[in-house]
Swiss-Prot record:
Record-stated family: Belongs to the GcvP family.
N6-(pyridoxal phosphate)lysine found at: K708
Names of required cofactors: pyridoxal 5'-phosphate
Keyword Cell cycle: no
Oligomeric and partner information: The glycine cleavage system is composed of four proteins: P, T, L and H.
GO biological process, one term: glycine decarboxylation via glycine cleavage system
Cystine bridges: none
Catalytic activity: N(6)-[(R)-lipoyl]-L-lysyl-[glycine-cleavage complex H protein] + glycine + H(+) = N(6)-[(R)-S(8)-aminomethyldihydrolipoyl]-L-lysyl-[glycine-cleavage complex H protein] + CO2
Gene name in the database record: gcvP
Name recorded for this polypeptide: Glycine dehydrogenase (decarboxylating)
A Gene Ontology term for the protein's cellular component: cytosol
Its EC number(s): 1.4.4.2
InterPro entries named among the record's database cross-references: GcvP, GDC-P_C, GDC-P_N, GDC_P, PyrdxlP-dep_Trfase, PyrdxlP-dep_Trfase_major, PyrdxlP-dep_Trfase_small
Length: 957
């Protein structure tokens, strides 16, 4: 049959690249589950009353090449001025060896959060290095493995200060008046929901204020002044006030560590260690505190532990602090951190080492000294005598200076009264300084860089002697070895080989949607047009970003059935928080600020109650029935009991039990009947897109995990993006921004993230995905995700019972395998199965969530039938191994499951097990062997012997 030209052009080619099973494989699986077609299958599973009659109008699909060309044209509208704005963001030089071998490497960016440490030792080591950098530079005892950005780290510092404060009746938090404005913005937003009063004043006036439990200082103020706060911190400590200090990571290379001056908490952005500005993110924040406060710290902490053989191994420590365990009592609602960006920063420190970092920091400072000397020589006045990289220059003709700067394609900071701010960075050259002289002084300034250099080289007084660092940093061998590109490349590869990512095997984690992160989607994030923009540049320089963001928002509006989308939240947890704040502020606008009860089903993800608590709400749990659905009788009772105090319900759809609840619309109606709002958690949107939508179902607000449904990679535990979709009545209450107020910023509410559009530079990934898939492909992706899950469930249900099903025994896009009966019969647990899967070359499914003693499997649409069958065969082989234990062939205390995973060194060691080496490391069906480098971790040892900094190199060998 002759094909038409349209068929030959094949604009939907990417759909077949993204979706794993081809048409023949799909039909085989449909036959296996007893369905005639994808439409028939979804028609059976999804409740009729919520199925969309017509697909969302997001356009036809485009090829990879057409979409890249279209996005390149949009990106070209961005103007790449040289930005000296500062305010916590600077241009960087990302070493190409890190760009190519990490940021552009799926072995790093497609990995999941390291909850399974045996398959995560590489990125755990890189994160431990990040913690060591933090400890060395801050002078404190404990460091986390990254937070979302500097401003949210400040908010976390405030919350932590209250948790550890001995002044239990104090309710005021003091912020020095020269912290970055975006930091203050986020702190104020968080303080409102916690009921704290924020006082902003000159740091030296802090002692004038009463009932203060915590203080936030900034070592290098937002306009550049270096502060020696030693005496002030000492006085504050004598009054039992918790002191937090915001610090610049590059300045800390030269400046005294705040921890040495007595600070309790030190935090800041690691952006300038090699991570592009990206119009605001993503960037990792560093966070450190005194040892005595370690159990009150937010975020993940990597600790050194032992494996079952006694070898040194790394793991995430003290997880009992986190939301997935402590729920509303957690230290934070953080689920996604910034692992990929923290690892870039840590490897930047490894590559440059202490000598290289000091050279960079000294060069920045020298050029700043030269600029200052030249300007002063010509009669201009500096606001501050002490500075590192930022000058606040008083100018008589400010308008003229800014006009000349614009003509030279230069951005200066312009929001300072009668002055301009200039922040230099590692990309600044002597030619740039000469250009700045011309902008500020005119072309005939007559200044010479070399002459000025001689003047300042031996007589710099811009850093107070007491503020100069007098201790060594980064003395660990890892920071003093890998300085040639060859060595660095091999070190990074050695780390990558230790981990299991999507470039090696399917990652069947339920509730995580580990789908393909296509190369075409990833390419634009490193384009200079997207990577090099300052988040506070003039709006007319970011027209490409604004167009791309507006298009993406429009598509998401259509896909969700909402009326507006806010892009600011830079993680799913932040999206939850922002959505709940919108609900809170909406109620307040209706003079119903007393509505503070949030109903949450017992099956909910741990971030839900943690976010509700952070938003100042009381959590009331709604029971689930024996089938895992929300108990409508209990819901009505709880809603009626809450009455006029009902704020909202947080539900996930399909439910966290892996089914489409038939009564979801009734749930929405009950809550609305009692004056509440419906927050529909977008974690499972991959089973909705093109089939139904939150807005159509009846919800009022949702966050969308762009790092799940819309293809942003997980990065080993971040970055993520959690924009929120809202109905029109909530649109005025989504986050705004105090620094950037342009079209697309819907409101003037407080910010939840440092940058106006969150992690803007990864939004092109989701733009590309939607553009290449089109309406047709997006719906098909959801349908195949559902098919793949039902295929796995149908083939495994006889060996591992599927705990919850919907109509006709079907599941949604994931299924829960009940291991509890097997454990009762044999003693083999879900943990043993999870670790044994490593020997078969797979990352484990989600363990014991949402039900203890289970495994939740989500295959996504991107896995082919071949890979699904490989996983199914592995699970069936493991079931046969369990039967061997049950039959007494292998003892419960010594079998391939309880000893899993097995490592290479066991092949040449004494072998006293009742099963063979071949069974241990090459079980049935394993061809392309993945080798874990450690055996099962000893979690108890790790938490009892907490050690969170680098260990001797010999320990890794």
């Amino acid at each position: 049959m002759t094909q038409t030209l349209s068929q030959l052009e094949n604009s939907g080619a990417f759909i077949e690249r993204h979706i794993g099973p081809d048409a023949a494989q799909q039909q085989e699986m449909l036959n296996a589950v007893g369905a005639q077609s994808l439409n028939a299958l979804t028609g059976q599973i999804v409740p009729k009353d919520i199925q969309l009659a017509t697909p969302p109008q997001v356009g036809a699909p485009a090829t990879e090449y057409a979409a890249l060309a279209e996005l390149k044209a949009i990106a070209s509208r961005n103007k790449r001025f040289t930005s000296y704005i500062g305010m916590g963001y600077t241009a960087v030089q990302l070493p190409p060896v890190i760009l190519r071998n990490m940021l552009e490497n799926p072995g790093w960016y497609t990995a999941y959060t390291p909850y399974q440490p045996e398959v995560s030792q590489g990125r755990l080591e890189a994160l431990l290095n990040f913690q060591q950098v933090t400890l060395d530079l801050t002078g404190l005892d404990m460091a986390s493995a990254s937070l979302l950005d500097e401003a949210t780290a400040a908010a976390e510092a405030m919350a932590m200060a209250k948790r550890v404060s001995k002044l239990k009746n104090a309710n005021r938090f003091f912020v020095a008046s020269d912290v970055h404005p975006q930091t203050l913005d986020v702190v104020r937003t968080r303080a409102e929901t916690f009921g704290f009063e924020v006082i902003v004043d000159d740091a030296q006036k802090v002692l004038d204020h009463q009932d203060v439990f915590g203080v936030l200082l900034q070592q290098v103020g937002t306009t550049g002044e270096i502060h020696d706060y030693t005496a002030l911190i000492s006085e504050l400590k004598s009054r039992k006030i918790v002191v937090s200090v915001a610090a610049d990571i590059m300045a800390l290379v030269l400046l005294t560590a705040p921890g040495k001056q007595g600070a309790d908490i030190v935090f800041g952005s690691a952006q300038r260690f090699g991570v592009p500005m990206g119009y605001g993110g993503p960037h990792a924040a560093f966070f450190a505190a005194k040892d005595e406060y370690k159990r009150s710290m937010p975020g993940r902490i990597i600790g050194v532990s032992k494996d079952a053989a006694g070898n040194t191994a790394l793991r995430m420590a003290m997880q009992t602090r986190e939301q997935h365990i402590r729920r509303e009592k957690a230290n934070s609602n953080i689920c996604t951190s910034q692992v990929l960006l923290a690892n870039i920063a840590s490897l930047y420190a490894v590559y440059h080492g202490p000598v290289g970092l000091k050279r960079i920091a000294n060069r920045i400072h020298r050029l700043t000294d030269i600029l200052a000397a030249g300007l002063q020589q010509k009669g201009l006045k500096l606001r501050h005598a002490h500075y590192f990289d930022t000058l606040c220059v008083e100018v008589a003709d400010k308008a003229g200076v800014l006009t000349r700067a614009e003509a030279a394609e230069i951005n200066l900071r312009s929001d300072i009264l009668n002055a301009v701010g200039i922040t230099l960075d590692e990309t600044t050259t002597r030619e740039n300084v000469m250009q700045l002289f011309s902008v500020l002084l005119g072309d005939n300034h007559g200044l010479d860089i070399d002459t000025l250099d001689k003047d300042v080289a031996h007589d710099s007084r811009s850093i107070q002697p007491a503020m100069l660092r007098d201790d060594e940093i980064l003395t660990h061998p890892v920071f003093n070895r890998y300085h040639s590109e060859t060595e660095m490349m091999r070190y990074m590869h050695s780390l990558e080989r230790k981990d299991l990512a999507l470039n090696q095997a399917m990652i069947p984690l339920g509730s995580c949607t580990m789908k393909l992160n296509a190369a075409a989607e990833m390419i634009p994030i490193t384009w200079p047009e997207f990577a090099e923009l300052h988040p506070f540049c003039p709006p007319e320089q970011a027209e490409g970003y604004q167009q791309m963001i507006a298009q993406l928002a429009d598509w998401l509006v259509k896909l969700t059935g909402y009326d507006a989308v806010c892009m600011q939240p830079n993680s799913g947890a932040q999206g939850e928080y922002a959505g709940l704040l919108a609900i809170r502020h909406y109620h307040e606008s209706c003079n119903e600020g007393h509505r503070d009860i949030c109903l949450i089903p017992a099956s909910a993800h741990g971030t839900n109650p943690a976010s509700a608590h952070m938003a100042g709400m009381q959590v009331v749990v709604v029971a689930c029935d024996k089938n895992g659905n929300i108990d409508l009788t209990d819901l009505r009772a709880k809603a009626e009991q809450a009455g006029d105090n009902l704020s909202c319900i947080m539900v996930t759809y399909p439910s966290t039990h892996g089914v489409y609840e038939e009564t979801i619309r009734e749930v929405c109606e009950v809550v609305h009947q009692f004056g509440g709002q419906v927050y529909l958690d977008g974690a499972n949107m991959n089973a909705q897109v093109g089939i139904t939508s939150p807005g159509f179902i009846g919800a009022d607000v949702s966050h969308l995990n762009l790092h799940k449904t819309f293809c942003i990679p997980h990065g080993g535990g971040g970055p993520g993006m959690g924009p929120i979709g809202v109905k029109a009545h909530l649109a005025p209450f989504v986050p705004g921004h105090s620094v950037v107020q342009i079209e697309g910023m819907l409101t003037r509410q407080g910010a939840v993230s440092a940058a106006p559009f969150g992690s803007a530079s990864i939004l092109p990934i989701s733009w590309m995905y939607i553009r290449m898939m089109g309406a047709e492909g997006l719906k098909k992706a959801s349908q195949v995700a559902i098919l793949n899950a039902n295929y796995i469930a149908s083939r495994l249900q006889d060996a591992f019972p599927v705990l919850y099903t919907g109509r006709d025994g079907r599941v949604a896009h994931e299924c829960i395998l009940d291991i509890r009966p097997l454990k009762e019969e044999t003693g083999i647990s879900e943990l043993d199965i999870a670790k044994r899967l490593i020997d078969y070359g797979f990352h484990a499914p989600t363990m014991s969530f949402p039900v203890a003693g289970t495994l939740m499997v989500e295959p996504t649409e991107s896995e082919s039938k071949v890979e699904l069958d490989r996983f199914i065969d592995a699970m069936l082989a493991i079931r046969a191994e369990i039967d061997q234990v049950k039959a007494g062939v292998w003892p419960l205390e010594d079998n391939p499951l309880v000893n899993a995973p097995h490592i290479q060194s066991e092949l040449v060691a004494e072998w006293a097990h009742p099963y063979s080496r071949e069974v241990a490391v090459f079980p049935a069906g394993v061809a392309d062997k993945y080798w874990p480098t450690v055996k099962r971790l000893d979690d108890v040892y790790g938490d009892r012997n907490l050690f969170c900094s680098c260990v001797p190199i010999s320990e890794y060998q």
